[in-house]
Amino acid sequence: MRKRAATIGTLVAVLAAPGLAAEAPAEGTHYAQRTEYRAPSAAMAPVVDGIADESVWDKAAWQPINVRWLGPEYTPEDFAGRFKVVWTPERIYLLTEIVDDVLIDTHRDPLVQYWDDDTLEIFIDEDYSGGEHRFSHNAFAYHFSLDNRAIDLGTDEKPGDYTHHVQSAWKQYGDKLLWEVAIDIYADDYVDGAPDNAPVRLEAGKVMGFMVAYCDNDGSELRENFIGSEIVLSGPKDRGYIDAGLFGSLTLDEQQ
């Protein structure tokens, strides 16, 4: 991340506002008690089809989505989630297993209230630098809708469609969804609308910022729950779209 000091200074100012107090990031970049995720490499890329029958998925460990950021207590029948990650030099691949008893996608415009439908959210910080990213590409917060679009805020401070960064597919099996996603990884010099943006080529040993969440709505005007994979010790619990210091670390492991 470029200009880290200025970025963190801005973030501290935002979180110092009344009602938004939060602990300072450890060592200026990340908060305490972050999860250390690991992703095995895939000799052959999984097919993104919601079936997940490739043997490479057996090498990856499940990680829970079980931290309630917003909303009331929920039952395991209402929501349960877990995920695993693998990688190739071109992309990372995420397999998510979701229990959601009611699926909602009521906002037909993909750029309007996309967080209030059932949404898989994947947070990525290419260089694990932390800091603010709400209207920059220091990190990405991809909101995956049930129609497999990926939305994030752009540098113009408006929602943008980043579906060209990803592949997404899900299938329903009884009370569960298997949701597979492939994501190109971009550095913080990404420029919206530029024709020459190129994904980062991935290598073993690379460490990125990473976090997963799910917005659950069972029929209300607004989402009813927001559940993530990282704890938030203080301050607003739903600020992952602003603060990459909340992300865990994702290390890309050598092929076994």
Question: Would you name each region that the model predicts?
Answer:
Residues 9-18:
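Bacterial N-terminal signal peptides
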Residues 21-256:
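Structural preference for beta-rich elements and adjacent junctions enriched in aromatics
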Residues 1-9:
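Bacterial N-terminal signal peptides that target proteins for export
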